[in-house]
């Protein structure tokens, strides 16, 4: 994997609050190598380590995107949801930002059936098929469509398992991470000081609660994916 320069600036990270971890009582001792200090009862993340692993993650997604690989971005908590959808749309990635349905990847055949149902209902709606049904039946299908859109809207074009999964907040998305581990799908995970850094393929130590910190990390990864996609288009 070729190393590239991604302009990851320590001062910019500090302004985004990337270095603020959780309270010292809520920490995972395995995070010790990624913590540089304690301040007012809060662990401070070593941004040099953050920059190193974020750069490695950018190299990985660039290389994958330049080969036409598919990405899934997962971040379902309120602070991350909008950032995840915007980032994914910008980089033409799949995303889950509302709720992770158990077995979404490990039980892919069921997910595929749900996606087919979702596409069929969308087609019905677009062709005004609901208007030809009794009101009660139409109402049931509209509710079904609304629910499927909420949970599967970000993966509606996904035709198979993703090649790489990017996880925002490992604790929150633990089920998704375990499914990726079970299937051997490479993962990049944003980890705060209460996480286990040994679970994901690349763990990026960073504040996973601050919107600015999540945005900073996603922006770097999305830029690398977009650069990789441009390279793929030029070479194909």
Curated annotation (Swiss-Prot):
It comes from the Eukaryota. Gene3D superfamilies: Glucose-6-phosphate isomerase like protein, domain 1, Helix hairpin bin. One of its GO terms (biological process) is translation. It is found in: Plastid, Chloroplast. Pfam families: Ribosomal_S2. Keywords: Chloroplast, Plastid, Ribonucleoprotein, Ribosomal protein. GO terms for cellular component: chloroplast; mitochondrial small ribosomal subunit. One of its GO terms (molecular function) is structural constituent of ribosome. Belongs to the universal ribosomal protein uS2 family. HAMAP family: Ribosomal_uS2_B (MF_00291_B). This is Small ribosomal subunit protein uS2c. It comes from Barbarea verna (Land cress).
């Amino acid at each position: 994997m070729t190393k590239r320069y991604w302009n990851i600036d320590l001062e910019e990270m500090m302004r985004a609050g990337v270095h603020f971890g959780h309270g010292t009582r809520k920490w995972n001792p395995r995070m010790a190598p990624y913590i540089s200090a304690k301040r007012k009862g809060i662990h401070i993340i070593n941004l040099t380590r953050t920059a190193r692993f974020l750069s490695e993650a950018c190299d990985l997604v660039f290389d994958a995107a330049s080969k036409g690989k598919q990405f899934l971005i997962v971040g379902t908590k309120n602070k991350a949801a909008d950032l995840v959808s915007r980032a994914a749309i910008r980089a033409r990635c799949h995303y889950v930002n509302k709720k992770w349905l158990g077995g979404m990847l490990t039980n892919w055949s069921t997910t595929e059936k749900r996606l087919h149902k979702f596409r069929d209902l969308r087609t019905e709606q677009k062709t005004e098929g609901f208007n030809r049904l009794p009101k009660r039946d139409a109402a049931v299908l509209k509710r079904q469509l609304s629910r499927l859109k909420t949970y599967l809207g970000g993966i509606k074009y996904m035709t198979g398992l993703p090649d790489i999964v990017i996880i925002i907040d490992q604790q929150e998305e633990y089920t998704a991470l375990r499914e990726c581990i079970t299937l051997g799908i490479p993962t990049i995970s944003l980890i705060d000081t209460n996480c286990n850094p040994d679970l994901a393929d690349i763990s990026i130590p960073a504040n996973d609660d601050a919107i600015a910190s999540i945005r900073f990390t996603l922006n770097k990864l999305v830029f690398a994916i977009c650069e990789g996609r441009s390279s793929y288009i030029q070479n194909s």
